[in-house]
From Swiss-Prot:
This is Small ribosomal subunit protein eS4A. Pfam families: 40S_S4_C, KOW, Ribosomal_S4e, RS4NT, S4. GO terms for molecular function: RNA binding; rRNA binding; structural constituent of ribosome. Residues 42-105 form the S4 RNA-binding domain. Its main location: cytoplasm. The modification Phosphoserine is found at S32, S247. GO terms for cellular component: 90S preribosome; cytoplasm; cytosol; cytosolic small ribosomal subunit. Component of the small ribosomal subunit (SSU). Mature yeast ribosomes consist of a small (40S) and a large (60S) subunit. The 40S small subunit contains 1 molecule of ribosomal RNA (18S rRNA) and 33 different proteins (encoded by 57 genes). The large 60S subunit contains 3 rRNA molecules (25S, 5.8S and 5S rRNA) and 46 different proteins (encoded by 81 genes). Belongs to the eukaryotic ribosomal protein eS4 family. It is found in: Cytoplasm. Present with 573 molecules/cell in log phase SD medium. Signal peptide: none annotated.
Length: 261
C-alpha cells in the first residue's frame, strides 16, 4: 500500500476542464496542496502556458514566476503548481493585467479580465461560523480563509466581500430568495440566476430553485450555490455569456447568425 502524499497526476486523470490534450505527454502538473481542491483548481502553469500562451513550456513558466511577477489574491506565488480556484484574482505586474477565475457555462475556467479596482477584492462563501478559543467568533470561507470577529449577522452560505490588501470583511450578502447566484458545481456549473426558493431535505441534500435572465428555471444542490449580489447588481463583473446556458439548437442558430447564413 502506498504511503505518503501522491506526487504525480496522469494526464488522463487530470480534470477535464483543464483542456489538456491526451497525446502530448504521460503526466499532467499535479496541483500543490492549497486553498482549493485538486479537481476545482487550476494550477498557475496551466493558466499561464495553456490559457494565456505567455510561455511555451514549464521552464518558461518557472522563469516568469521566479521574477515574482505573478500574484494570486495580492500575494506573490512562485510555485508553478499553485492551485488557483474560483473567485481568485491573478495579477500579472509585468503586463498590468488582472484576471478573476470564474466558470463559463461549459464548466471551464474562463479567462476573465478585470479592472484594477475590481482586483482589490474578492468574494468568499461562508462555510463555517464558530467560536474559537476564549470565545472569539470566526468564519471560514470556501478558499480556506479564517476571519476573526466577523459581523454577528453573517451565517453559513452567506457571501462575504474580502479586501485583499487587509484580509478584512468589508461587506456581506445574505443568502435569500431574489439574490443573484453563481452555480459552482454539478451539471449546471457556470450558470447565473436568481434564487426562487430553497427546499429543505432532512437527511438529504437541500435543493435551490434558480431562474436565469431568460426565465429558464433549474435546480441544484445548496452547496453548489454561491451568492454574488442582488438581482441585476452583481458585486463582480460577469464573464462573456453572462452565465446563460443555451440549448444546442440555440447555440447553432446563434453561430449561423454570426456567420451571416
Amino acid at each position: 500500500m502506498a504511503r505518503g502524499p501522491k506526487k504525480h497526476l496522469k494526464r488522463l486523470a487530470a480534470p477535464h476542464h483543464w483542456l489538456l490534450d491526451k497525446l502530448s505527454g504521460c503526466y499532467a502538473p499535479r496541483p500543490s496542496a492549497g486553498p482549493h481542491k485538486l479537481r476545482e483548481s487550476l494550477p498557475l502553469i496551466v493558466f499561464l502556458r495553456n490559457r494565456l500562451k505567455y510561455a511555451l513550456n514549464g521552464r518558461e513558466v518557472k522563469a516568469i514566476l521566479m521574477q515574482r511577477h505573478v500574484k494570486v489574491d495580492g500575494k506573490v506565488r512562485t510555485d508553478t503548481t499553485y492551485p488557483a480556484g474560483f473567485m481568485d484574482v491573478i495579477t500579472l505586474d509585468a503586463t498590468n493585467e488582472n484576471f478573476r477565475l470564474v466558470y463559463d457555462v461549459k464548466g471551464r475556467f474562463a479567462v476573465h479580465r478585470i479592472t484594477d479596482e475590481e482586483a482589490s477584492y474578492k468574494l468568499g462563501k461562508v462555510k463555517k461560523v464558530q467560536l474559537g478559543k476564549k470565545g472569539v467568533p470566526y468564519v471560514v470561507t470556501h478558499d480556506g480563509r479564517t476571519i476573526r470577529y466577523p459581523d454577528p449577522n453573517i451565517k453559513v452560505n452567506d457571501t462575504v466581500k474580502i479586501d485583499l490588501a487587509s484580509g478584512k470583511i468589508t461587506d456581506f450578502i445574505k443568502f435569500d430568495a431574489g439574490k443573484l447566484v453563481y452555480v459552482t458545481g454539478g451539471r449546471n456549473l457556470g450558470r447565473i440566476g436568481t434564487i426562487v426558493h430553497k427546499e429543505r431535505h432532512d437527511g438529504g441534500f437541500d435543493l435551490v430553485h434558480i431562474k436565469d435572465s431568460l426565465d429558464n428555471t433549474f435546480v441544484t444542490r445548496l452547496n453548489n450555490v454561491f451568492v454574488i449580489g442582488e438581482q441585476g447588481k452583481p458585486y463582480i463583473s460577469l464573464p462573456k455569456g453572462k452565465g446563460i446556458k443555451l440549448s444546442i439548437a440555440e447555440e447553432r442558430d446563434r453561430r449561423r447568425a454570426q456567420q451571416g447564413l
